[in-house]
Amino acid sequence: MTKKIGILVGSLRKDSYNKMVAKKFAELLPEGFESTFIKIDDLPFYNEDLEVEGSVPEAWDRFRKEVGEVDGLFFVTPEYNRSVPAALKNALDVGSRPMGSSVWGGKPGLVVTVSPGGPGGFGANHALRQSLVFLDVPTLQQPEAYIGGIMNLVDNDGHIADGTVEFFKTITDKYIEFFNKLVK
């Protein structure tokens, strides 16, 4: 049976490096796995007042359904002010509510942070992991995926350097091993 990996990209920018990286990770999934990109840019900010039957935003219902249908999760995000972008944090909140109905629990996760700077989104990576611990999303610990200096790893046509793709493949292979230990 094919396993489905949901990919959430924290950057909303059309020509985002994060989207390029996420697409490459999706391509590297082995046979028996497929990916789906889960849209977060249309989610109204979480507000508990909207959690009444008949008032729940349609985008929240769609998002929760899509996350609920996947077996594992890839989070690919930039770093904003040493944390994750508001759109991604909002997606985590929307998926975790109403209390007791979280769609996140038990789905193996991979955190990839992409940055033009040298630290490769270290702050966002760890801020996201902290939220994922609370949401019961076990995450791959090694190798860590900090993709720094991204502008030097992608050419003008959007092709990612071979050595970087090899690193992505190593990460993907380790994630699949991790996933298979957790999901039977």
Regions found by a protein language model. Name each.
Residues 138-184:
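Glycine-rich phosphate/pyrophosphate-binding loop and the adjoining helix
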